[in-house]
Amino acid sequence: MACCESWREALTSGGPVRFAWDPCVYEPSDDTWIAVEALERLGALGYRFESVLDLGSGTGVLAAVARTLFNPSLVAAVDLSPYAAKATRLTLGPDSLVTQCNGGRCLRGRWDLVILNPPYLPAEANEVKACEGLLDLAWSEEAGHEVLCRSAGDLGNQVVIVRSSLSTLDVDSCLSSMGFSKVATLSNRAFTLERIWTELWRRAA
């Protein structure tokens, strides 16, 4: 498996965060930075988390940002793609807990915070067949949005989820049916053809 990674940098309220990127991994875009804004807002509000899971990590930049902002005792990341798992491991360091698997099926226990920026585009909107079709999985909602949503509900006490007006998944029903309530909208941005926002959900006591 070839990996032609390069290094990028994201500026956050906690300082710069370096992350590895590979052409076969979803490149951080508007939805990523809106998720970063959400994490920054949680930090500004005084939230702290002892354990953080980045579910569908891609480059691992959101896990790295969470580590910078919250200084948790444990940060872990999961992605189906071997390219993404490798990039995330480079981003977080050789001793990091990074696993390649589908959703959270390889994990047990509960995490204080699960971060989820899921694939949400219709399958026909971005048919990328390069990289053994793995890049397409990072875009297309059909490939696993509901699987990831339910994994987040299984594993998290609180969930930060990125949402899009282009998505057809009923996220409210997905998380509500698993005992979660929406706490707040953390960031919200409108574009020409799309609105992207992030929400914080919390498991009922």
Which functions belong to the PLM regions below?
Residues 21, 37, 143-201:
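Conserved Class I SAM-dependent methyltransferase catalytic core
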Residues 27-30, 79, 130, 142-146, ...:
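Residues at secondary-structure transition points
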Residues 27, 61, 82-83, 146, ...:
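Short alpha-helical
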Residues 2-69, 104-107, 184-186, 191-205:
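SAM-dependent Rossmann-like transferase core, predominantly class I methyltransferases
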Residues 36-109, 113-127:
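Conserved SAM/SAH cofactor-binding pocket of Class I
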Residues 118-147:
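Mobile active-site "lid"/loop adjacent to the S-adenosyl-L-methionine
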